[in-house]
Amino acid sequence: MKEIRVGLIGFGTIGAGVAKILNNNQEVIQKRLGASVSLVKIADLDIKTDRGIDIEEGVLTTSVEEVIDNPDIDIVVELIGGYEPARTFLLNAINNKKHVVTANKALLAKHGDELFELIEEKGLTLGFEASIGGAIPIIRSIRESFVANRIQILEGIVNGTANYILSKMSDENCDFDVAFKEAQEKGFAEADPTFDIEGIDSAHKIAVLTRIAYGTPITVSYTHLRAHETPEPRV
C-alpha cells in the first residue's frame, strides 16, 4: 500500500488535533485513499508540553528544517499562523518539492499570489480548504462544483465569532459585551479577538474567496472594514 508521509509545522491546539485525527483514523483514511498516512516529523518550539496524544519517539523536533528538508516527507502542513515565518517556511517547502497544506487565511490573503505561482511552477498542490468555513467545503464548491457558473456575489457571515455574537445579540436582544463574554467562555473567540471583532479575519477570507471566485487577487487594504455594531432584534 502506498504511504503518504506528512510533516507538521506547529504543535499547538490545532496541530495536536491534526495529529490525533491522523493517528486515530488510520483505518478510515486507508479505505478512502487507498493509502496510509504517517506522521514523520512534527516541529514546534515547545515539544515538552503534554498535548494528550501519543507521539512516537524521534518524531517531535524543535527544528523546522527537519521537516522542510526531510526527503522522506511528501506533504508539509503549516499550523503556526501569521505572516512570517509561515510564508518563508512554505516557500522553502515548495522549493524542496513538497506539497503543502495550510489553514492560514491571513497568509493567503497577503501572499497568496506568490505561493500559488510557485506551486504552479513546481507542479505541486497547495491545500487550503480549512482556511475558510471549517468543515464547510466552500473553497472546493467554488473551484469545482461552480466552475461553469457565473458567480455574481459572495455574501455571508464568514467569521465564527461574529456569527455567534451577532446571533446572540439579535435573538436575545443582549448587549455586545454580554454576547462577547459568552463567546469567549465557550471558546468561540480568541484570547485576543481583535481580528474577529474588527473584521480583519473576515477581510482575509473575502480576499481569498474573491481570488478563487473571480480570479482577481485583492488584499485587505482594498476592503472596507467596520467593527461590530448592535443589530436590530428579531421580532
Regions found by a protein language model. Give the residues of each.
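Short, ordered loop/turn segments at secondary-structure junctions
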Residues: 45-47, 105-106, 113, 131-133
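Conserved small/polar residues in nucleotide/adenosyl-binding loops
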Residues: 223-232
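ADP-ribose/adenylate-binding Rossmann-like module
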Residues: 94-110
